[in-house]
């Protein structure tokens, strides 16, 4: 049993190191969910690329967390895997909406008083999905922090 504990501790330390590396990459590439009313196509192209890069790194980060959780509590790890899937789905939906804004940047302009219903719906959906992404990411991080404090700290 002691050998198992030593192996688990070593594996957790290795995973923890990988997680720290991914975390520092994420910190450098931090994505702001703040909505800017920029109406240039170039701005939205850059924003989309930044979000895609951020989501790719975030998925690697969350998958690493899920790997750590799976070593300790498979049930919680499976639930976290569902949360990762939802994060990916929300990110994909946000990128799709941002592509629509990229094609018609005036959608985001709140000063435009003659917006069509279509534009208003896209903007509303953008705000909704953007908020959902932010809230879901917070939820995942809080869940992991709690798991870390309760389960992982006692192993490390």
Predicted regions: what is each one?
Residues 1-23:
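Cytosolic juxtamembrane helix and N-cap/initiation of the first transmembrane helix
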Residues 2, 146-156:
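Short acidic DE-rich linear segments
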Residues 11, 18, 25, 54-57, ...:
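Interface faces of extended alpha-helical assemblies
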Residues 20-76, 115-139, 143:
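Alpha-helical segments in soluble extracytoplasmic regions
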Residues 35, 84, 130, 148-151:
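Prokaryotic Sec-type signal peptides and long signal-anchor helices
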Residues 69, 81-83, 156:
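Extended alpha-helical regions
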Residues 74-126:
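Long, amphipathic, charge-rich alpha-helical segments that form helical bundles/coiled-coils
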């Amino acid at each position: 049993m002691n050998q198992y504990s030593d192996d688990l501790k070593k594996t957790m330390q290795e995973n923890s190191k990988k997680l720290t590396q991914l975390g520092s990459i994420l910190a450098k590439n931090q994505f702001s969910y703040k909505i800017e009313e920029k109406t240039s196509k170039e701005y939205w192209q850059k924003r989309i690329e930044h979000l895609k890069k951020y989501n790719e790194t975030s998925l690697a980060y969350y998958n690493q967390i899920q790997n750590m959780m799976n070593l300790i509590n498979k049930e919680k790890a499976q639930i976290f895997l569902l949360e990762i899937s939802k994060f990916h789905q929300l990110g994909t939906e946000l990128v799709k909406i941002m592509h629509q804004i990229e094609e018609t940047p005036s959608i985001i302009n709140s000063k435009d008083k003659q917006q069509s219903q279509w534009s208003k719906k896209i903007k509303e959906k953008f705000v909704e999905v953007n908020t959902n992404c932010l809230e879901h990411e917070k939820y995942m991080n809080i869940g992991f922090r709690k798991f870390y404090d309760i389960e992982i700290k006692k192993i490390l």
